Amino acid sequence: MFEKIEELEVRYHELESLLADPAVLGNQPEFRRLSREHNDLTPLIESYRTYKKVLEEMEGNRELLADPEMKEMAQAELEELEQRQEELEGEIKLLLLPRDPNDDRNVILEIRAGTGGDESALFAGDLFRMYSRFAERNRWKVEVMSASESERGGFKEIVALIEGQGVFAKLKYESGTHRVQRVPETEAQGRIHTSACTVAVLPEAEDIEVDINPADLKIDVYRASGAGGQHVNKTESAVRITHIPTGIVVECQDERSQIKNRAKAMKVLKTKILDGLHQEQNARIAADRKQQVGSGDRSERIRTYNFPQGRMTDHRIGLTLYRLDSLMEGDIAEVVDALRTHYQMEALKAQAEAA
C-alpha cells in the first residue's frame, strides 16, 4: 500500500512543478486537467505525510520509555499516537479506493410521479423542493430543464440541471424509488395513503463523450402547455427530440425561445445516452462479480417518508431519522454522508476479499 503512495507522492511533486510552468499556464485545458489531478491527490498525500510524522513521534516516544522519569508521560502519548495511526491508516485506505470519475460532475436530476396519482405528483414536488434546498446549502445552482405540472400541484415529471462542486458524489445514491405514506388533504376518513416517485441522478455528459448523428434525431416543435393542458405560448417554442436508435425521448418547454429549449433538450439527451452506456457497462461488471455495490438501480425501493410518524427510513442502510420536517427542508447531509460511508466500506470489503 505504502509503495503505491510513494509513487503517487513523486507524481504529486511533478504536478506541482508542471502547474508552475508558464507553458502549462498558457494552455488552459491542460492546466485544468493537471489541477484536477493535483486536487484529487492532495487529501491522500496530506494524510500520508501526517501518517509519517506520527510514526516518527511514536519512535521518539518508544525511546523515552527507557527513561524512568519520562516513562509514564511517553506511554500515555504513545497510546494516543497509536490510536491516531490506526485512524490515519483507515483514512488512507479509503483515499486509495478507485475514484468514481463522475464524482465531480454536474447532474441531471429527474423526478417522476409513480403510483398514487395526485398524491404522487405532490410528493414529486416535495422531493424537488428538498433537493433544491440541499443545493442551496451547498451553493449549487439549480436550473429547471423541463417540467410537467399536475393540476392539483406538484409535478408529473420534472428534470433539472444541478451545477456545482462534487454534486454527483453527494447525490448519486438518491437514484431509486422513494415511497411516501401520509394522509391526503382530500381524505375525509384520515386514512394513510401510500404513493411513490422515482428519482434518477445522471452525471452530466460532456460534448466530447457523446457523438450524435443528426440523422438519428426526430425533432418536433409544439406550443408549450401549462398544468391544465392549456397553451401558454402562441409560438411553437416547446421541443421534443427522439433519438431513433435508442428510443430515448426528451422534451423541453421551460424557455420561451425554441433555440434555448432545443439546446437544453440536447443536453439532457446526451446525458441520457451516456447514462445508458454506463448502465450497460455496470451490468457487465455486476455479472462478473455477481453483485453491484451502490449501483443506483432505479427500480429499487430505497427510502420511505412516513409523515404521520415524522419518520424517514433508508432501507439500504437501515437508517431511520425522526425529523422529517427538517429533512424535507433540505437538511439531508446526515443521510448523504451515511450512504457514502456505507458504500465506501462495502468497496473496501470487496477490495480486501479480492486481494
From Swiss-Prot:
Spell out the Pfam families in the cross-references.
PCRF, RF-1
Q: Does the keyword Acetylation apply?
A: no
Q: What is its main location?
A: cytoplasm
Tell me where in or outside the cell this protein is found.
Cytoplasm
N5-methylglutamine: modified positions: 230
Matches recorded under InterPro entries: PCRF, Pep_chain_release_fac_I, Pep_chain_release_fac_I_sf, Prokaryotic/Mito_RF, RF-1
Q: Extract the GO molecular function terms from the UniProt entry.
A: translation release factor activity, codon specific
Free-text description of this protein's post-translational modifications in UniProt: Methylated by PrmC. Methylation increases the termination efficiency of RF1.
Gene3D superfamilies attached to this UniProt entry = 3.30.160.20, 3.30.70.1660, 6.10.140.1950
One Gene Ontology cellular component: cytoplasm
- Can you tell me which family this protein belongs to? Belongs to the prokaryotic/mitochondrial release factor family.
State the function annotated in the UniProt record: Peptide chain release factor 1 directs the termination of translation in response to the peptide chain termination codons UAG and UAA.
Protein known as: Peptide chain release factor 1
